[in-house]
């Protein structure tokens, strides 16, 4: 587990710079549990593959401001390229991306670049900002945030597979870059004050998995500085269908979907939580071109979760996934 723990050697000074040094003791205790070698039965498969990845030299240059996060050096030999490909494939399924590492294109399930293209034009400039990304997955958007000038990009996601993918990418993209990963939930972050230090807080694709969406929004607000910006992306239902959908069992084959509000209702939630200037900046029905099965994620994907006779409905008969991006400001 050494590479997981080494990730934090440069993180603690960054935390101090962000006026969150008082978090360190609590985070170290939480990480000790999260990074227990027995925490995930797949670690015996991932750890040797991660060692293989880390044995390769870091890349000479990286590109963070285009669709695929790229890292490249002198061309690898075909043998080395195949060795690296197999090591990276040990971390399947790759869900959020895409990435291109030394000529190896990791075609992820999601075109996360498409989401970023929809979100980024509406953001306040990220230049010099401290950014918190809740539910960051493999960390694709953390790199895009740095590409747009963020001073610090901190991702939070309990998935150890996602952290493993992130560490593999960071090895090539740049170990010194200020992007970090905490394999925790939002609820596990320290609540000791001051905690209102982040200029922008993202929560994308998380709210509908929360049993208490209002608590989730309030938790997000806790870490925003006064005047900071919340970016909330979640499933919604068309306004014409009412205010709220509570799926009876599964939604698009997901059994952990609790509340899907209309855009109007979601706006009311944000206002109830004390946010101002609440606006919906994007509304998009997810297509089978944006979320699909690939060589790097060869499990079922969106096409398998929709009604085979009507792609505007899920297999359970609900409206197909419609995602809204809401932006709101925390009062000064």
From Swiss-Prot:
One of the GO BP terms on file: tRNA wobble uridine modification
Catalytic function, reaction form: carboxy-S-adenosyl-L-methionine + 5-hydroxyuridine(34) in tRNA = 5-carboxymethoxyuridine(34) in tRNA + S-adenosyl-L-homocysteine + H(+)
InterPro entries, per the entry: CmoB (IPR010017), Mo5U34_MeTrfas-like (IPR027555), SAM-dependent_MTases_sf (IPR029063)
Coiled coil regions, renumbered to chain: none
Enzyme class: transferase
EC number(s) from the headed UniProt entry: 2.5.1.-
Alphabetical list of Pfam families matching this protein: Methyltransf_9
One of the record's GO molecular function terms: transferase activity, transferring alkyl or aryl (other than methyl) groups
Swiss-Prot/TrEMBL keywords: Transferase, tRNA processing
Binding site for carboxy-S-adenosyl-L-methionine: 96, 110, 115, 135, 186-187, 204, 208, 323
Transmembrane segments: none
Domain of life: Bacteria
PANTHER family in the cross-refs: METHYLTRANSFERASE, TRNA U34 CARBOXYMETHYLTRANSFERASE
Family according to the record: Belongs to the class I-like SAM-binding methyltransferase superfamily. CmoB family.
Oligomeric form and interacting partners: Homotetramer.
Function (record text): Catalyzes carboxymethyl transfer from carboxy-S-adenosyl-L-methionine (Cx-SAM) to 5-hydroxyuridine (ho5U) to form 5-carboxymethoxyuridine (cmo5U) at position 34 in tRNAs.
Protein's name in the database: tRNA U34 carboxymethyltransferase
Species of provenance: Hydrogenovibrio crunogenus (strain DSM 25203 / XCL-2)
């Amino acid at each position: 587990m050494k590479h997981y723990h080494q990730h934090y050697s440069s993180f603690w000074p960054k935390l101090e710079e962000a006026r969150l040094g008082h978090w360190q003791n609590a985070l170290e205790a939480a990480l000790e549990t999260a990074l227990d070698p027995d925490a995930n039965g797949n670690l015996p498969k991932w750890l040797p593959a991660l060692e293989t990845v880390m044995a390769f030299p870091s890349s000479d240059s990286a590109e963070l401001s285009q669709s695929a996060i790229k890292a490249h050096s002198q061309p690898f030999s075909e043998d080395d390229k195949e060795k690296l490909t197999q090591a990276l494939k040990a971390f399947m399924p790759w869900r959020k991306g895409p990435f291109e590492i030394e000529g190896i294109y990791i075609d992820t399930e999601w075109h996360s670049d498409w989401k970023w293209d929809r979100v980024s034009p509406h953001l306040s400039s990220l230049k010099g900002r401290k950014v918190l990304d809740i539910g960051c997955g493999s960390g694709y958007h953390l790199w895009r945030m740095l590409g747009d000038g963020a001073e610090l990009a901190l991702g939070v996601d309990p998935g150890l597979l996602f952290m493993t993918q992130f560490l593999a990418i960071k090895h090539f993209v740049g170990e010194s870059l200020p992007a970090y990963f905490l394999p925790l939930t939002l609820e596990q972050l320290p609540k000791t004050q001051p905690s209102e230090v982040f200029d922008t807080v993202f929560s994308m694709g998380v709210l509908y998995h929360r049993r208490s969406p209002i608590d989730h929004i309030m938790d997000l607000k806790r870490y925003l500085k006064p005047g900071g910006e919340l970016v909330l992306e979640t499933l919604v239902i068309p306004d014409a269908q009412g205010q709220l959908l509570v799926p009876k069992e599964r939604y698009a084959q997901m059994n952990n979907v609790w509340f899907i509000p209309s855009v109007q209702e979601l706006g009311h939630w944000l206002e109830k939580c004390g946010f101002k200037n609440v606006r919906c900046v994007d509304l998009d029905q997810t297509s089978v071109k944006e979320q699909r099965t690939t060589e790097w994620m060869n499990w079922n994907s969106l096409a398998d979760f929709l009604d085979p006779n009507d792609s505007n409905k899920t297999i359970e008969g609900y409206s197909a996934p419609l995602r809204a991006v809401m932006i709101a400001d925390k009062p000064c």
